[in-house]
Amino acid sequence: MKPTTETYLNPTINDIARVAEVSLATVDRVLNARPGVREKTISKVNKAIAELGYVRDAAAANLARGRVYNFVFILPANDNEFVSSLQAQIDQLNINLRHDRTVLSFVRVAAFDPMALSAAINAIDKSQVDGVAIFGPETPSVRDSIAHLKANGLTVVSLVADIPSSERDYCVGIDNVAAGRTAAQLLGRFLGKKRGKVMVLTGSMLARDHLERRLGFDEVMGQDFPHIDVLASLEGRDDPDLIERLLPDALAENSNVIGIYSSAAGNEGLVRFFNSHNFDDKPAVVAHELTPLSRTALNNGVIDAVISQDPGHLIRSAVRVMRAKRDQRPLNSAQERI
């Protein structure tokens, strides 16, 4: 290998080939991880790349090969404004990325149904798709399906709710434990010295984001507001009709409910319930996701605070992560923080 005494401001693959003393074809094979190159030669090429400070122009390389990225999002199929906003962001970004050789699509599957989610993952055409972003529960069947995607060379991102025990490449979403802690701080301050009970609405105990929010919520309520009793989670499955039916009985069974924490995104049933009932002393309410419905409820005093995450940021971040992983480029972690 030739010593590098020259300064290369913008090194090219020709420079790599010259310094490593190999052919351009060999450099191309190494850069694209293709077979047929000896380990010793790969080491020489990688050493030349490091010494020259070569940074691959992935966009130019993809354009030269006519490559198109194909990314699929799997979303829950529930009646939920937050999920609908994610879908709308996918549609809009798909239009914006047409010039960037990137195609986005989505699949909707039954919410909180791990078998349906696994079936949707398994149905993906591995030969046509580069990456998959999954918003769904963490179960053994889902982990197995993700492992199958990885075995076929696809990039996998968990979206909103993490699936850490799987082989997923990255999680795009907020820190849900911290979100639960924030909800407890807000609700505790709203309630002050009042004694009573707090009801926790959740979508499903299968949903890791809901579980993590509950964990953070309980931690702060127990430490900072021990005079308030936190009730067991009421599972509404993000179904507005079910939530509207469950709330009257739950409030009748538990006297002196002074606060409600809605840890899921399905707030329609909660809002409908409060709009149709009168309270001498309405419970304070903290919810998740700023949507047209929750914004109106905030303005009307039905909801007292909303903890939000930006749907557009979530989708854009998922796409950036999947592209970076496919191109083997480093991530800007600060940019992907939701």
Which stretches of residues belong to each language-model region?
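An alpha-beta-alpha
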Residues: 183-224, 330-338
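Hinge/beta->alpha junction and helix N-cap segments in small-molecule ligand-binding domains
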Residues: 76-84, 105-117, 138, 172-182, ...
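Hinge/cleft segment of the Venus flytrap/periplasmic-binding protein
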Residues: 221, 310-338
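N-terminal helix-turn-helix DNA-binding module of bacterial transcription factors
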Residues: 1-67
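Amphipathic helical "hinge" segments at domain boundaries
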Residues: 56-119
